[in-house]
Structures are given as structure tokens and as C-alpha cells.
Amino acid sequence: NRLSFGVQTFNDDLLKKIGRSHRAKDVFESIENAKTAGFDNISIDLIYSLPGQSKQDFVQSIQTALGLGLVHYSGYSLIIEPKTVFYNLMQKGKLPLPGEDAEAEMYETLMEQMESGGLRQYEISNFAVPGYESRHNLTYWDNEEYFGFGAGAHGYVNGIRQSNYGPLKK
């Protein structure tokens, strides 16, 4: 019963650069609306190593995120997938990504800031107030069974991982 927002960053310039339609103010408004509607288990996802992102940009996003007082946060390094706009730009040398050392520093900073904020790291990318860890994630890492329902869903039953077809075409 968690509501999760794909914030990525609170830096409006970076959001625009990576093609996101939302801005930081939209995140604040959405989280406030969720709280007003009665949600208390709210999570946000941040991404680091974005094109043109500095360590200071990421630190500011972490501090802004922690200021929201949520119970769960995820922090992921940007992964460039084939057949995407970012992949094509990278192939042409037109995607200014932070180097590996900068990426490692951002991850270390994420861990330090989350711990300082009272959150416990319970897997490589996830941090939670104790008791608010993702049950699905823990089930996955503990090699327990789970069912996947719906287009594109994944499951693990009787030692076999399976995925459903998806997404559906219009």
C-alpha cells in the first residue's frame, strides 16, 4: 500500500533536459494531495548520474527529498538502455554524463545523507524508516514466491521466473 512518485530530481533545468513534463512544484503539490487523501506510505525515486548533473545538484535533490519527511526513498543510477533517445545521443557523443568516479561519489553521498536522515538502507537502492521497507523487494531478494498479474507483470513460482506479455497495444 505504497504510493510512489518518479521524481528523478528536484532540479527543474535537469527535469527539462531529460524530457520530463513535471517540475519540482508539481511534486510538492502531488505529495501534499496524497497526504491530504490519507496516504502515509509515500515513496519517491531519485536518479543520479543524469546528463549534466553535478554532485551538488544531487545533494540538493536529496536534501529536498528528505525535507518532505517521507517514509521511503529509492535512488537509482541512470541506466542507458538500447533503442532510447539517451542511447542514441550517447552513441553520437552528445550526452554529457558524469564520469564513473562522480557517479560513485553520488551513490556514497546518497547513502550518507539517507542514514543521516534516519533512514535504513535495506537494499542497494532503497532506504526506509524501519517498518516501511518494500515487502515486494524483500520477497524478491529473499527468493520467495510471488505472482505477477497484468500486462508486463513478473512472477516467481516453483523456482521459475516468468513474465507476462505487455504492454497491450491500443
PLM regions: where:
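C-terminal scaffold of the Radical SAM
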Residues: N1-K170
